[in-house]
Regions:
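Short, solvent-exposed secondary-structure boundary/capping segments
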Residues: 30-40
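Intrinsically disordered, low-complexity, charged/polar segments
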Residues: 42-99
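Short beta-strand-centered aromatic/proline hotspots
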Residues: 20-30
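Short, well-ordered loop/turn sites that connect or cap secondary structure elements
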Residues: 4-7
């Protein structure tokens, strides 16, 4: 598959070392760890096909954890404009964290 940048919401993926598919429900996510430090994730998702079950069952993950893409989510001009901004934000966040 030839796709660059963030996948759109609705994309269904399988993560490495996993047997349950996830549907992407958000991008550019931050989580605060027990140490109080923020950690950045590319995506948040819910199990597929069940969908949202509870706040405790949202899964944070990064693009490098994706093993297989089953379906790419819906895209239109609005989502493509958002993707462009989100891709730029991810690059900026990663550059700051590496620098």
């Amino acid at each position: 598959m030839n796709f660059s940048g963030l996948f759109p919401i609705g994309t269904v993926v399988l993560l490495k070392d996993s047997t349950k598919r996830l549907m992407i429900t958000g991008v550019c996510q931050f989580s605060v760890g027990e140490d109080g430090n923020q950690k950045f994730y590319d995506y948040v998702g819910v199990v597929f096909p069940e969908g949202y079950l509870s706040a405790d069952e949202n899964y944070l993950f990064n693009a490098d954890q994706i093993e297989k893409v089953f379906c790419i989510g819906y895209q239109d001009s609005e989502s493509l404009a958002f993707k462009e901004k989100a891709d730029a934000a991810v690059e900026e966040i990663r550059a700051k964290s590496e620098g």
